[in-house]
Design a protein with these regions (language model features):
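N-terminal glycine-rich flavin-associated loop
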Residues: 1-20, 38-84, 92, 96-129, ...
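N-terminal accessory segments
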Residues: 1-27, 318-339
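Short beta-strand
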Residues: 22, 198-204, 291-296
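Short active-site-proximal "capping" loops at secondary-structure junctions
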Residues: 25-29, 41-43
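Conserved glycine-rich FAD pyrophosphate-binding loop
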Residues: 39, 242-365
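Short, conserved charged micro-motifs
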Residues: 63-65, 177-184, 226-234, 272-279, ...
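C-terminal substrate-binding/cap subdomain adjacent to the FAD-binding core in PCMH-type
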Residues: 112-262
Length: 365
């Protein structure tokens, strides 16, 4: 299916006023048999290792991108939760990210340009690989994280990074039994002469499941040449005791969420992460099977529970630092996902500009 074919499908749905859900590999959410799938839109269109840029069709999987860039000792520093069977299109449409966002940022920081089909069937290009963007709008950032509610993403251009010579992960011992202990530790880690690629806080439940101990632990992913990594490890060892853990820990964290889980993301200023962490831990202390992990550099706590149950509404009211974002509530009906966090009237006006008949779904898979 080409971009032109996708545009024709969208125009037909727009003429009929028929809702048109968008699907990728359906690894996270299946919008049903009537969805417009871009999973067949696979393949790398252009890869210039010397420029550290790559353009791929939206249905290209993260695994395919990892293989291609790995052969050049490069990588796309997006590690969204789930598996590498997910597509780059869905990753960008949902602005999904993982632990590497600590150092490298989110999709809005890494996506250089897009090709997309708007809700009236128009084909547009934004950002990279074009001479001129639409005046007054950063459409690349607008479409990234819009959950398919503004346009069908058909092609993505991303920024790559060189892979570090050494990539090592350590576990830093954490005391969070005293009210100020975690905050003090995180302050010392931030002040240390180290620049972790990822810095992820794990609650005891997920730490035990992944074989990282039975208490709260802080994982630090260190990268660089051998001398740099040794120096960073020594700096962090001066803060608290450290042990080496396997690199597969990061893949295990990303793949730990079952499809039926509730996933709720809460955020605060990074300096207030310890306070938010304590609030979430206390609120979920009697929630069987619940666990949490936090991306320190983003100030974000990710709460996962196998059975949302009635307690989910309580979680939505205890966010210590900001509005919670519901990524998924298992199979519970009646919940949606706010794709942008924008005021409703502003979001309605934006959607009407790109999808005048309201046919595009705010769901992506």
């Amino acid at each position: 299916m080409s971009t032109q074919t996708i545009a024709e499908r969208v125009r037909e749905a727009s003429a009929r006023g028929t809702r048109l859900p968008i699907a990728g590999a359906r690894t996270w959410f299946d919008p049903g048999p009537d969805a417009l799938s871009v999973a067949a839109e696979r393949g790398i269109v252009e890869y210039t290792p010397g420029d550290l840029t790559l353009t791929a069709r939206a249905g290209t999987t993260l695994a395919e991108l990892a293989r291609a860039t790995g052969a050049e000792r490069q990588w796309l520093t997006l590690d969204p939760h789930g598996t590498d069977a997910g597509t780059i299109g869905a990753t960008v449409a949902t602005a999904s990210w993982g632990p590497l966002a600590h150092a490298f940022g989110t999709p809005r920081d890494l996506v250089l340009g897009l090709e997309a089909v708007t809700g009236d069937g128009a084909i547009i290009r934004t950002g990279g690989r074009v001479v001129k963007n639409v005046a007054g709008f950063d459409l690349t950032r607008l479409f990234t994280g819009s959950w398919g509610s503004l346009a069908v993403i058909t092609e993505v251009t991303v920024r790559l990074r060189a892979r570090p010579e050494v990539d090592e992960t350590i576990a830093i011992a954490v005391r969070d039994d005293a009210p100020d202990a975690l905050g003090a530790l995180l302050a010392k880690v931030r002040a240390a002469s180290a620049a972790p690629l990822a810095l992820e806080l794990l609650s005891p439940a997920i730490a035990a499941r992944l074989g990282a101990g039975a208490s709260t632990v802080l994982l630090a992913r260190l990268g660089g040449n051998a001398e740099s990594v040794r120096a960073q490890r020594a700096a962090l060892a001066a803060v608290s005791s450290v042990t080496t853990v396997g690199d597969d820990m990061w893949r295990a964290i990303r793949g730990s969420e079952a499809a039926e889980s509730a996933v709720i993301r809460l955020s605060a200023r990074p300096s207030r992460l310890a306070e938010l962490w304590r609030t979430v831990r206390e609120a979920t202390s009697h929630w069987s099977g619940a666990y949490a992990h936090a991306t320190v550099g983003r100030g974000v706590v990710r709460l996962v529970a196998p059975d949302p149950g009635p307690g989910v509404t309580d979680i939505l009211t205890v966010a210590g630092g900001g509005m919670p974002i519901v990524e998924r509530l298992g199979s519970l009906p009646g919940f949606g996902v706010d794709p942008g966090g924008a005021p409703p009237e502003l979001w309605r006006r934006i959607r009407s500009a790109f999808d005048p008949h309201g046919i595009l779904s705010s769901e992506a898979a």
